[in-house]
């Protein structure tokens, strides 16, 4: 066991609840003892939203231990179904209540018989994954559930998944056209469009990043099809395959969903994080290539005139022209890199630590765009260690993969860097 103070990523049920509470009209029921039900207070304090956090704790007490949980869990699901009328009720245990080894899937099946809402059990191993891994898995599970539900309602529709699998073994033109059709036989959007996967509650600057992504896509004449899970409706998940491609801003959450959609519908995706001038340039080029791939291989209703009117239509000229304009006349990144504040750090030693996405991107920005010496770059995402090492290789002297705050504290005290780019924990260490 670890003290909550020393944890970079929380237990698995926190990730599941973050995804559930990000969707609109979704209610989560947490099967847990007293002490595990702090998510409501934490989210209300940090997000400061007007609405109540849609999470109910089904408390495991002495009566439950004596008689079993089924009656209480089913009763709570049915009560919330009548009171809230949510589109989806998500049941999740915690690592503590998992010790009871109860058949929660049976509870869900029983509650589903009398509930008008969909009822789903979060399929997460609470002893093997952390908060971020559980969030990634839960989002993919919810998307899979509603796409399969839509297919089951319309069994006569074409099977894009089958077409996608056929395309892997056969490059026939008809297979390609079937594969690139939208949800359950629907067509792609007329204009180039994208889904943004992985924006959710309590995320690090997720709202600001989403706003900037939407602005970037609008300037490139790319429509936003769906943003999930933050502010999304589960009833709209069937529309995900209508987009031309998927954007995964953060590897931690959304990557499994993008891989699933690629496998089932042949939808390309990019997991390049547009942080910094160089990575934003690569991000724009990837989007241009994906748009051309879909336009050339699919039966979209986008006319050649409409497509060529989009800024993204010229894969060679547009990214270079757009990026040069943004760098020299719009963005202040180049100005900041030459400012006194930044030049004071030029050649100085720094330490970077955080989640894999932000730590890797920040390391590259500091080295390539600001000329700052990164002595140590690290992440607490141990499950993504190989990718992180590959990304920061050649940009730092030392790579640290750990979720123990004392190790990064020791390294900071040894190096004595001029600046620390890290989490709240590193802020306390630096003081």
From Swiss-Prot:
Intracellular or extracellular location(s)? Plastid, Chloroplast
Looking up SUPFAM superfamilies in the UniProt record yields:
Helical backbone' metal receptor
Q: Any idea which GO molecular function terms this record carries?
A: 4 iron, 4 sulfur cluster binding; ATP binding; metal ion binding; oxidoreductase activity, acting on iron-sulfur proteins as donors
Q: Which residues form the active site?
A: 341 (proton donor)
State where it is primarily located. plastid
Q: What is its EC number?
A: 1.3.7.7
> Disordered: where is this region?
150-187
InterPro entries to which the protein is assigned, alphabetical: ChlB/BchB/BchZ, Nase/OxRdtase_comp1, Protochl_reductB
Chemical reaction(s) catalysed: chlorophyllide a + oxidized 2[4Fe-4S]-[ferredoxin] + 2 ADP + 2 phosphate = protochlorophyllide a + reduced 2[4Fe-4S]-[ferredoxin] + 2 ATP + 2 H2O
User: Where, by residue number, does [4Fe-4S] cluster bind?
Assistant: 36
**What GO biological process term is on the record, naming one?**
light-independent chlorophyll biosynthetic process
Q: Which GO terms describe its cellular component?
A: chloroplast
Enumerate the Gene3D superfamilies for this protein.
1.20.89.20, Nitrogenase molybdenum iron protein domain
Pathway terms, separated by semicolons: Porphyrin-containing compound metabolism; chlorophyll biosynthesis (light-independent)
Q: Which UniProt keywords apply?
A: 4Fe-4S, ATP-binding, Chlorophyll biosynthesis, Chloroplast, Iron, Iron-sulfur, Metal-binding, Nucleotide-binding, Oxidoreductase, Photosynthesis, Plastid
Q: Subunit comment for this entry? A: Protochlorophyllide reductase is composed of three subunits; ChlL, ChlN and ChlB. Forms a heterotetramer of two ChlB and two ChlN subunits.
Name the PANTHER family for this protein: LIGHT-INDEPENDENT PROTOCHLOROPHYLLIDE REDUCTASE SUBUNIT B
The entry assigns this protein to a family as follows: Belongs to the ChlB/BchB/BchZ family.
What this protein is reported to do is described as: Component of the dark-operative protochlorophyllide reductase (DPOR) that uses Mg-ATP and reduced ferredoxin to reduce ring D of protochlorophyllide (Pchlide) to form chlorophyllide a (Chlide). This reaction is light-independent. The NB-protein (ChlN-ChlB) is the catalytic component of the complex.
**What is this protein's name?**
Light-independent protochlorophyllide reductase subunit B
The record lists the lineage as: Eukaryota, Viridiplantae, Chlorophyta, core chlorophytes, Chlorophyceae
């Amino acid at each position: 066991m670890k003290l909550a103070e020393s944890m970079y990523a929380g237990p698995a049920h926190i990730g599941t609840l973050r995804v559930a509470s990000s969707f609109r009209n979704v209610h989560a029921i947490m099967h847990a003892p007293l002490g595990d039900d702090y998510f409501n207070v934490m989210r209300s304090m940090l997000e400061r939203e007007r609405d109540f956090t849609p999470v109910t704790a089904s408390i495991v007490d002495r009566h439950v231990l004596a008689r079993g949980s089924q009656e209480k869990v089913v009763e709570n699901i049915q009560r919330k179904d009548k009171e809230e009328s949510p589109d989806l009720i998500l049941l999740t245990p915690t690592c503590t209540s998992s010790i009871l080894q109860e058949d929660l899937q049976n509870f869900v099946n029983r509650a589903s018989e009398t509930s008008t809402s969909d009822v789903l059990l979060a399929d997460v191993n609470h002893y093997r994954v952390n908060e971020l891994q559980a969030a990634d898995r839960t989002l993919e599970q919810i998307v899979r559930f509603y796409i399969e539900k839509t297919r089951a309602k319309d069994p006569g529709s074409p099977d894009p998944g089958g077409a996608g699998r056929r395309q892997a073994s056969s490059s026939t033109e008809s297979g390609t056209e079937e594969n690139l059709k939208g949800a359950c036989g629907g067509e792609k959007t007329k204009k180039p469009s994208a889904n943004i996967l992985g924006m959710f509650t309590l995320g690090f600057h997720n709202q600001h990043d989403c706003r900037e992504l939407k602005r970037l896509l609008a300037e490139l004449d790319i429509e936003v099809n769906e943003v999930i899970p933050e502010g999304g409706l589960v009833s709209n998940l069937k529309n995900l395959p209508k987009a031309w491609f998927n954007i995964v801003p953060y590897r931690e959450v959304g990557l499994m969903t993008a891989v699933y959609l690629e496998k089932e519908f042949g939808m390309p995706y990019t997991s390049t994080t547009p942080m910094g001038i160089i990575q934003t340039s690569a991000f724009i080029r990837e989007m241009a290539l994906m748009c051309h791939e879909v336009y050339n291989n699919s039966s979209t209703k986008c006319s050649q005139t409409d497509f060529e009117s989009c800024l993204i239509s010229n894969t060679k000229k547009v990214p270079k022209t757009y990026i040069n304009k943004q760098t020299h006349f719009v963005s202040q990144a180049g100005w900041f890199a030459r400012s006194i504040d930044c030049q004071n750090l030029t050649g100085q030693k720094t330490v970077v630590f955080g989640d894999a996405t932000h730590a890797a991107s920040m390391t590259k920005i500091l080295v390539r765009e600001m000329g700052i010496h990164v002595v140590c770059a690290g992440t607490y995402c141990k499950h993504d260690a190989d990718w992180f090492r590959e990304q920061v290789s050649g940009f730092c002297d030392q790579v640290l993969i750990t979720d123990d705050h004392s190790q990064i504290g020791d390294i900071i005290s040894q190096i004595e860097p001029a600046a620390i780019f890290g989490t709240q924990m590193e802020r306390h260490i630096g003081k």
